[in-house]
């Protein structure tokens, strides 16, 4: 068995030790010098970049749907009616070879009203756009869209429950690169849905001050996708995950508004993203465990100009975790006819 000719510059050694001649790896690379999936117990930079794009898409959907934002401000005293909310921020994910940073803008709007049964119910539309950064100057453009319904009810004894469901679609148009700048471009898009519930109890103190422990549980299914990135074919499995959260809010009501600070800890109990990559005659597999814990801190408030018009705003930041919100700023208004 002759070794691969040294005169062909496009033949690059495998990232690990030089393969034995009987493995015949060099001839395979010669036949396809643009191969993006190589034999061995490792993933190539193009595979790693594609994993980053998939994880960014999942985290974009999570950012769009996980906080039950409208129910929270209604609980704090916001009037029902037509409302809109715009926000922006950053989040990152770092783990298992995936390293992503995303800057995003989120817009939500809807309408809600009180019913005779004691529930406040509403419908909403949500949209997110994000720009991703990956290893070796890779990049992605995220888009996520969802429609949903929500409701909240006073259970008595200063207790409440919030419920919400959202269904929509998320996509990521990405370009990934390896160490020498060779790039692959592709687009992954899939359907997703989320349902969740939150329980809280308000402990009223003196002078309008309160303490409010909260517990939240949500379930998300993020669909699978099959797509091409250059000459590499990718099959991503669907993933289902359950997320639980505990929070403690401390605030103060004053006149027509309130101020608060909230500390939260969240944990993903389940979820594995399984992906198959094929380039030429070579196929490899990766399995991404998305279980983990993260914490966040928020400050915010609301103010009512009159019975029909009010504003609300908050700023939050992540404190720890593989999934970490760098910062987020949100503001909105409600108008009641």
Q: In which residue ranges do the predicted regions lie?
A:
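Outer membrane beta-barrel transmembrane domains
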Residues: 205, 234-337
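Transmembrane beta-strands of outer-membrane beta-barrel proteins
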Residues: 82-84, 121-123, 147, 161-163, ...
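Solvent-exposed, glycine/polar-rich loop segments of beta-barrel outer-membrane systems
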Residues: 96-102, 137, 171-189, 221-242, ...
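Short, internal active-site loops enriched in acidic
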Residues: 89, 128-130, 218-220, 264-267
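Outer membrane beta-barrel translocator domains of Type V secretion systems
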Residues: 29-211, 316, 321
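Short, structured loop/turn "capping" segments at alpha-beta junctions
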Residues: 206-212, 222-226, 255-259
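Short, well-ordered alpha-helical segments in soluble proteins
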Residues: 171, 201-203, 217-223, 254
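Cleavable N-terminal export/targeting peptides
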Residues: 1-35
């Amino acid at each position: 068995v002759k070794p691969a000719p040294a005169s062909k510059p496009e033949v690059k050694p495998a990232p690990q030790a030089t393969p034995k001649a009987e493995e015949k790896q060099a001839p395979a690379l010669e036949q396809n010098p643009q191969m993006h999936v190589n034999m061995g117990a490792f993933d190539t930079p193009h595979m790693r970049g594609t994993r980053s794009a998939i994880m960014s898409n999942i985290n974009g959907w999570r950012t769009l749907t996980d906080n039950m934002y409208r129910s929270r401000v209604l609980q704090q005293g916001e009037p029902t009616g037509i409302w809109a909310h715009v926000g922006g921020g950053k989040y990152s994910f770092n783990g298992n070879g995936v390293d992503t940073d995303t800057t995003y803008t989120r817009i939500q709007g809807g309408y809600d009203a009180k019913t005779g049964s004691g529930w406040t119910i509403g419908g909403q539309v949500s949209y997110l756009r994000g720009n991703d950064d990956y290893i070796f100057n890779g990049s992605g453009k995220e888009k996520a869209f969802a429609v949903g319904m929500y409701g909240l009810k006073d259970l008595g004894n200063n207790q409440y429950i919030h419920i919400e469901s959202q269904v929509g679609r998320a996509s990521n148009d990405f370009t990934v690169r390896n160490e020498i700048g060779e790039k692959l471009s592709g687009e992954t898009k899939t359907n997703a849905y989320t349902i969740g519930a939150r329980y809280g109890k308000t402990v009223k103190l003196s002078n309008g001050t309160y303490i409010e422990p909260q517990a939240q549980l949500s379930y998300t299914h993020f669909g699978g996708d099959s797509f091409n990135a250059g000459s590499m074919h990718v099959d991503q499995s669907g993933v289902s995950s359950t997320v639980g959260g505990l929070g403690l809010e401390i605030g103060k009501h004053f006149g027509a508004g309130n101020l608060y600070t909230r500390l939260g800890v969240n944990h993903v109990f389940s979820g594995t993203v399984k992906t198959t990559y094929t380039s030429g005659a070579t196929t490899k597999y990766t399995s991404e465990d998305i279980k983990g814990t993260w914490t966040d801190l928020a400050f915010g408030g609301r103010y009512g100009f009159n019975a029909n018009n009010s504003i609300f705003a908050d700023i939050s930041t992540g404190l720890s975790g593989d999934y970490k919100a760098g910062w987020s700023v949100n503001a909105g208004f409600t108008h009641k006819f």
